[in-house]
Amino acid sequence: MTSHALLTVEEAARRIREGRALILAGDEAALARLPAGTWIGGTTPYFMTAEGGLRSRDHVFASEVPAAAERVAIAVYAAADLPRVYAELPERGYGVLLMPLFSLAELAFAVGAPGYDGFATRPLVGWVSGTDVGDTGRRAPKVYDGRTGAALLQEAVVLQVSLPAAITAEIGIVNVFSAGGGDVLGFAEGGFSASEVLVDGRLRGLTGYLLETGLDVRRPLVGEYCGARLNVGVREVDWAAGVVHFWAPVFPGISYRHAAPVGEYVDEFLARAPAQVLAAGTEGLGFCCNCYSNYAHGELEGKRTGPFVGPVVFGEIAYQLCNETLVYLSVGGPRG
């Protein structure tokens, strides 16, 4: 039986009752019907499956914790408690963190994670839950503590997985975007929105700069954080107020460039993924998620993304909050 699958609610409930430890994604109506057990979940109706990308309110995507896991625990964190999240991960193993879009937990983690005690010393992956884009503003994103079935609006939930010494967990990011050759951009203040931008060191109004240059806001800004190339996608441009809202925060002191154009998304994903991960296939993955912006702009509905199956989400976690990336966790023996 595959460890990652799109299931009916009844199939997911059966696996929970069998005592399996699961990471679940689905519409609120589907997740609310599940029994208590060792699982965490988050809302999204979009998925990458072996048959291609799809939208479904009636199914649940399940990723099962590897059978080799020695211990699985669940913890809930309020925003003020998140600085402990790395210190409380198992010494050998990994964590999966889920939090609702625009929740207090997401805002705290997005800005504060790099300063947490033990940041990036242990593998932490996860995602930001959302809703069908047609329900934006009408339904709230949620995450679930499967021990009780409680739906959480402002907190984060973490699955803590302990592994034997012979098993390793390694985070990977597939980013189809690279920095273009345009202006170097910076921000004097950090956050999820900005009205001003530093253009090659000169302060300018951000919306005016976008109008003047005609930048395609479907492509993100690309910056380097802690040696990794990460994206900041534009969520909305409020032309009247002169403010740009982002899916992930910008940080002062980071240099950004507008992303270069991308060709066929699936081809780019597979070309940039490590060969050993592709060879290992889905069974070698302990976790995977892709960004909704990639799903929408890359027109991934009905398209297959190789071994990378999982939920389509509204922010990805690979140590810290990422955007417009595919994040995965490889679980297996030591590599030679």
Where are the model-predicted features located?
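Hydrophobic alpha/beta core scaffold segments
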Residues: 1-336
